[in-house]
Amino acid sequence: MKLKLHKADPKEQIQRDEVTFEGWGQKLSLQQYMKRESTLRSHSWGYGKSVETWLLKNEQGDILSSCETYPIVADQVWGVGSVFTEPKWRGMGFATQLLRELNALLTAFRQSRPSAVILFSEVGERIYERAGFRAVESNEWVIDVDQCSPELCLDHTGMKLEYISDLSEISGYSQGLVIDQDRFWIHPSLAQLRWHHLRESIYGDFFNQGVSSVYGVKSSRSYLVWTLDYKLDSLRILASRFFDGVEQRSLLSQAITFAQAKGMPQVRIWDSEQVFRDRFRTDLGFASRCVRREDSIAMIHILSPDLLKGHWVNLQRGLWM
């Protein structure tokens, strides 16, 4: 069977939304889902880049599988999301073939720069491993807000903290791909963080929750950026920077207080390379547990030799798409 990778035009994107509603339209009507997708696709990612939809077709023009690509780091790191195969085409390897074709296309496009493709799987690892992806540690800390007493959230450090109302207020925010010997970091761009907040505002409107004007909390050198997940009733930390456990506690205390005020029962923060591990039970004292993220397993496909021996560390929720 001869298969071809095809970039969808705007009309095809809308038609595909009607199909993928089955997979990602939970808690939404079809009309709401269609509005969500068109609004998120209209978001500006900078660099003249945008979200693109890719279709794997056979000779008859049937769409066998589809996905979207996101410009995480301009011409270096691409994110893959919304991989979808209709039930009648499942079990035939079409999603794997779609990603193989896409990886080949991006490899040819990368222009000799360190580059990679990332995704976050909600269907396990095997299907993506066959396309050349490998999984990395995917845990998160879940803080149960109703078990955190007000006393635990009091800040006794004297740190001057301010809420973030504009992401451009974050001084020294790192963006892009950073390589350090055998490790590398991928930082979500401010455009991607704004995409998360656009998503929050869409759900806030659908669920009559309004739109929050607070995007996180900062000190003179540290910050937490968060979003309110109305779909899963959680405050999610998108990006963070702190230099010790004292700063970490102060920032998280503010996140918990804000979640309580918004009626969110949980605060969730991704954990990679034991950045947060063990501190919650010792330094912090918050009611928390570390769990594997079965609905967003981080996976990466390296496109360039520069990163083959590297270890992807410090994964932030802000990279999710």
Locate the predicted segments by residue.
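Extreme N-terminal starter segment of soluble prokaryotic enzymes
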Residues: 1-3
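A short, well-structured alpha-helix characteristic of acyl/acetyltransferase catalytic modules
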Residues: 9-23, 163-188, 310-317
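Active-site rim helix/loop that mediates acceptor-substrate recognition in acyltransferases
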Residues: 20-74, 179-214
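Conserved beta-strand in the GNAT
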Residues: 51-57, 61-71, 77-84, 216-230, ...
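Active-site/acyl-donor-binding loops of N-acyltransferases
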Residues: 67, 120, 126-153, 227-321
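Conserved GNAT acetyl-CoA-binding A-motif
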Residues: 78, 99, 106-122, 261-272
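Conserved acetyl-CoA-binding loop-helix of GNAT-fold acetyltransferases
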Residues: 82-85, 91-107, 245-258
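Amide-forming acyltransferase catalytic core, primarily the GNAT-like/NAT-type
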Residues: 134-237
